[in-house]
Amino acid sequence: MKLIPFLSEEEIQKLQEAEANSSKEQKKTAEQIEAIYTSGQNILVSASAGSGKTFVMVERILDQLARGVEISQLFISTFTVKAATELKERLEKKISKKIQETDDVDLKQHLGRQLADLPNAAIGTMDSFTQKFLGKHGYLLDIAPNFRILQNQSEQLLLENEVFHEVFEAHYQGKQKESFSHLLKNFAGRGKDERGLRQQVYKIYDFLQSTSNPQKWLSESFLKGFEKADFTSEKEKLTEQIKQALWDLESFFRYHLDNDAKEFAKAAYLENVQLILDEIGSLNQEFDSQAYQAVLARVVAISKEKNGRALTNASRKADLKPLADAYNEERKTQFTKLGQLSDQIAILDYQERYHGDTWKLAKTFQSFMSDFVEAYRQRKRQENAFEFADISHYTIEILENFPQVRESYQERFHEVMVDEYQDINHIQERMLELLSNGHNRFMVGDIKQSIYRFRQADPQIFNEKFQRYAQNPQEGKLILLKENFRSSSEVLSATNDVFERLMDQEVGEINYDNMHQLVFANTKLTPNPDNKAEFLLYDKDDTGEEEESQTETKLTGEMRLVIKEILKLHQEKGVAFKEIALLTSSRNRNDQILLALSEYGIPVKTDGEQNNYLQSLEVQVMLDTLRVIHNPLQDYALVALMKSPMFGFDEDELARLSLQKAEDKAHENLYEKLVNAQKKASSQKGLIHTALAEKLKQFMDILASWRLYAKPHSLYDLIWKIYNDRFYYDYVGALPNGPARQANLYALALRADQFEKSNFKGLSRFIRMIDQVLEAQHDLASVAVAPPKDAVELMTIHKSKGLEFPYVFILNMDQDFNKQDSMSEVILSRQNGLGVKYIAKMETGAVEDHYPKTIKLSIPSLTYRQNEEELQLASYSEQMRLLYVAMTRAEKKLYLVGKGSREKLESKEYPAAKNGKLNSNTRLQARNFQDWLWAISKVFTKDKLNFSYRFIGEDQLTREAIGELETKSPLQDSSQADNRQSDTIKEALEMLKEVEVYNTLHRAAIELPSVQTPSQIKKFYEPVMDMEGVEIAGQGQSVGKKISFDLPDFSTKEKVTGAEIGSATHELMQRIDLSQQLTLASLTETLKQVQTSQAVRDKINLDKILAFFDTALGQEIFANTDHLYREQPFSMLKRDQKSQEDFVVRGILDGYLLYENKIVLFDYKTDRYDEPSQLVDRYRGQLALYEEALSRAYSIENIEKYLILLGKDEVQVVKV
């Protein structure tokens, strides 16, 4: 098909005007049209929530296909496999519809080919692309194409630990062992072992994996913060902060004296307030840093007088208490900040004093990390097993170092498209740069929805382009999709009201202005005052009803509040449970939520990713059983097994057995005591009665049989033997939640089987792997069971991204943000590198014996403090984006649920807004979502916000006030006169009969596979001939085949099959470098790269391969490598003559030469034969299929077909 030109700006403008003037019920927006049809430059589409970005992507792809672009010329990256599948499904429907609608024969044929090629199109995650890429080009780096992915976290942890200990030993015994010992002690903590260091090493490694070149970043950026440390500049910054903090305090005190303080005229604290004002008043702008530090010290000292109550307003008058509380709260905030600044003066002094020592420690750390990264890389190459990040690194390495590969992809891809661009990381960005020609990128995303920083996603990649394209349109086009087609005006107004007051460049990384605000566009949704967003607060009184210690036994106030609203929606408004979603920022409180919903009989469906598999009781029992089989001298595991339902020893029996110690031994394990009891070799043998002796004998016999069975058998077989011997699998199935328990046990056997298939063998290593997972405070994913159909959805905000629900409750608004990262011993930054806490040993100068002579002081390096500030801003920005994602999931109504003391919250005062935003300190001091929402509610009271708040107390949450779930009986009235059950059965039988008739009529279509390979449909092309007793290749054993009674060959010599030789020969022919002269030596080197056994390699005749390239066809291939295509996959749509149904044929062409008006197709065959005509007849149909596929793909009729026969001593090339 001839390419149709893309639209010009003027044509796009006319299309926009025509759409605006059309009578369509739901029109495309001008920006959507621009995003669909603009071409010829890099395009960044900033698509707000619900703005139809998937629609835009599909329409853009469809437009390009309709203009003659091939689906294989598009690189389309999605964030998840699910998103890729959905995109392909949409495209399939759209292309099929377009084929039916068009009368253009060329377009019909072109789109038909695209539909057939759709399964093989480059549409998927970056990981799926890099896997295919490395499978194809990995040989350039000596990577075998049969590599596997280390997806199992436990296996990955085992490998990491083994490599860590190897590198650890090398450094511990090496030349720099003194420096390394210092590094080890720096992270040892109370454990006094290597675990602290190991934890930081793995953390840094995960960070490095997101960079495009880990070793390069280590060498160039790891120490950057130490190299550019400027203490003079830091001192000046600190002085400015002290100045500002003192002026803020002065303003607060003066305002207080002029206003509220008049109510407390004779209060003692006011004298101290005046003292501080005098101290601050003595300063002027010209004073140096020493003067400001001195005043700060005196001010802080005054605040600490009278046990820290020198400035406290202690008024107890009821009517003045709110004023006093508000003053004390603000004063406390002010002095907390001043105290921190005072501490920073001392810290900065220590940082400067120990800068050299910390730098030396960091260099040692750099050396260790470099060795660990390289050793782990080599180990994974030995295993031929890689993480996804490794695959990406190798892909980048090939694209950077092999220009011919890079250029082939840049020429192939007409456009490089990426969805969810805001969640991209630096390694992925580098790959996209290499695949693009520099002006053909189409990037879709929304920085407000970037919530994967913990996976090393960097929203600044998106933000940098956003700012650059906005300021310099010649660098790229920025298109804004702001219209929201998902949510009601009530949801959007509430969302805008929150974020236009919360998010700016300073805190939030973007300014939530007209460019980012959501615009209501769903004309089908009419405004409804009942759907106004609600901020619901459980009124927690000062008695602490919600103390964590009570939550396990008492339903939380917030959940009773939520249940009341759910029942109201369900029973009063007829809302189905599946229309309601409960969103949480983490799963920490899920147990409380599930307990509450269960209590009221509300069905619930979770997101299925609770990682508590190893905590389930039935799995713990099995793990202890395996531990005992491996080593019965483990008392805890042995007791657990004996007490388990498999054997049922009670406390009395265990107590009797535990007293069976041999008299001549000081200490014995429980197992040794069991042996003594059996042998009656203890002075307490009288405690063992007959029934217990019998029970003990049975236990010991079974345990011995298991231990004996474990040696020659697989873990999988051992586990199932345990299940069957003691009926444990059946037992747990009869317990409450039995199917889920059985699924857990079944999964244990499967996981053990997977473990042994991943090059790890044996019970010992399996147990060690499990213990390491538990030691690292990890767990394995729980096993999913079928959820109820109509159920409330409970999921994390992260899981909800991309989904939508009519009614959304955002729970746990009061749950504090996770700040573990900022408390770590190490904080990393792309800009500054390593920030680390240095442990310094200091002399105390103490003379008395009871005082320590030295103390250890933890000193955060200057870079650590800088990285900490950077991390804090990035974390707060991400939390804002997380809240944005949660709020924009709602279609009709949004509920935000938290808790707090009404009295305390309403007495809270906040600094005035600045430029329509919350004060930056207010935003940065917030501990949770609720703090932000409440501050907005208070500061902007006069703005008539589009969400309301209300407190709900205990009196409104009694059992009677909440109500009960009304359950409708499945049985109707018992009156037989109205019983229509027989009619229903009759109707069902009629339907089944119709289905059977339909199935009979269309049986051929039903039995036809939707996808077939050339060998599967070869029967359509085989000539009819008398071949009784002869097995056709691939068709299975013929009925008349004779059974062989020859003695089996028990020799240890490795057997080589024809299939193995054929597969290895094909790979060899693919790998041969045709850019240089072929010799026997070069072929021998290439053969070494082929992934097969040496026995198979020995069977490949290289002289024969070399002889092929002396033939006319071989010479033609050698002379036209720029026209050569090898190992090319294809898909083709065909019609089954019997059923008249379409199916897809897929296969791989060994190779062909593509000329302007001719194609030369060739196929290698290693089958043994007597006459060439045998193979020609056998493969004529297969080559005919290949010919048809090439003809349809390139619209070329002149196709020459050759079989290259390698099954005899001499090579033969036969034209078919």
UniProtKB/Swiss-Prot annotation:
Give me the Gene Ontology terms describing cellular component. Answer: cytosol; DNA helicase complex
Q: PROSITE patterns under this entry?
A: UVRD_HELICASE_ATP_BIND, UVRD_HELICASE_CTER
One GO biological process this protein is involved in is: double-strand break repair via homologous recombination
Instruction: Kindly list the GO molecular function terms attached to this UniProt entry.
Output: 3'-5' DNA helicase activity; 3'-5' exonuclease activity; ATP binding; ATP hydrolysis activity; double-stranded DNA binding
Keywords (alphabetical) are:
ATP-binding, DNA damage, DNA repair, DNA-binding, Exonuclease, Helicase, Hydrolase, Isomerase, Nuclease, Nucleotide-binding
Q: Which residues form the UvrD-like helicase ATP-binding domain?
A: 26-488
Q: Which residues form the UvrD-like helicase C-terminal domain?
A: 515-802
Provide the catalytic activity annotation. Couples ATP hydrolysis with the unwinding of duplex DNA by translocating in the 3'-5' direction; ATP + H2O = ADP + phosphate + H(+)
EC number annotated for this UniProt entry: 3.1.-.-, 5.6.2.4
**Cofactor(s) needed for function:** Mg(2+)
Task: List residues binding ATP.
Answer: A47, S48, A49, G50, S51, G52, K53, T54
| Annotated coiled-coil segments of the chain | none
- Please give the NCBIfam families that the UniProt record associates with this protein: addA_Gpos
Which PANTHER family does the entry link to?
ATP-DEPENDENT HELICASE_NUCLEASE SUBUNIT A, UVRD / RECB / PCRA DNA HELICASE FAMILY MEMBER
Q: To which protein family does this belong?
A: Belongs to the helicase family. AddA subfamily.
Function comment: The heterodimer acts as both an ATP-dependent DNA helicase and an ATP-dependent, dual-direction single-stranded exonuclease. Recognizes the chi site generating a DNA molecule suitable for the initiation of homologous recombination. The AddA nuclease domain is required for chi fragment generation; this subunit has the helicase and 3' -> 5' nuclease activities.
Q: How does it assemble?
A: Heterodimer of AddA and AddB/RexB.
Q: Under which name does UniProt file this protein? A: ATP-dependent helicase/nuclease subunit A
**Gene coding for it:** addA
